[in-house]
């Protein structure tokens, strides 16, 4: 079944020049396609909506600060099982636990600055795509 998912390349990925490498890995995997891509600086309101479920947790404020520290790449990936697949390609949040060959395993340095966000379910993908790409049908 063809799916769509939101992927964010976080400020550390942009700062380190990893956009092409990460986008290439997504495109090469299982014939997935990038159907929208924007470089943007996220405002506090958008981030609050996106990460609202984490408000009050110890990592929330540092995460909000980090995500506003520079531009991000927001993109839409489409393909068979792309939601599960991009998360697997990204690897676990902790780069030490991430296997070589995964994005975080190959390029990750610390848990908080972990290069990439990918929707974790069809429901999350739908909500996140509406937030980041409201004009998408």
Swiss-Prot record:
Source organism of this protein record: Streptomyces griseus subsp. griseus (strain JCM 4626 / CBS 651.72 / NBRC 13350 / KCC S-0626 / ISP 5235)
Pfam family of the protein (one): NDK
Catalytic site: 117
PANTHER family xref list: NUCLEOSIDE DIPHOSPHATE KINASE (PTHR11349)
Main location, first listed in the record: cytoplasm
CC annotations in GO: cytoplasm
HAMAP family: NDP_kinase (MF_00451)
Enzyme Commission number(s): 2.7.4.6
First-level EC class: transferase
CC cofactor: Mg(2+)
Protein name: Nucleoside diphosphate kinase
Residues bound to ATP: 10, 59, 87, 93, 104, 114
The entry's keywords: ATP-binding, Cytoplasm, Kinase, Magnesium, Metal-binding, Nucleotide metabolism, Nucleotide-binding, Phosphoprotein, Transferase
Record's function text: Major role in the synthesis of nucleoside triphosphates other than ATP. The ATP gamma phosphate is transferred to the NDP beta phosphate via a ping-pong mechanism, using a phosphorylated active-site intermediate.
């Amino acid at each position: 079944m063809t799916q769509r998912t939101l992927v964010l390349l976080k400020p550390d990925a942009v700062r380190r020049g990893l956009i092409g490498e990460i986008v290439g890995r997504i495109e090469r995997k299982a014939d997935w396609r990038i159907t929208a891509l924007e470089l943007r600086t996220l405002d506090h309101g958008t981030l609050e909506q996106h990460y609202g479920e984490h408000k009050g947790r110890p990592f929330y404020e540092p995460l909000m600060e980090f995500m506003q520290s520079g531009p991000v790449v927001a993109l839409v990936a489409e393909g068979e099982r792309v939601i599960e697949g991009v998360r697997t390609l990204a690897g676990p949040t902790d780069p030490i636990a991430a296997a070589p060959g995964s994005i975080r395993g190959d390029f990750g340095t610390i848990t908080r600055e972990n290069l990439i966000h990918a929707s974790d379910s069809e429901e999350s993908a739908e909500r996140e795509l509406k937030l980041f790409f409201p004009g998408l049908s």
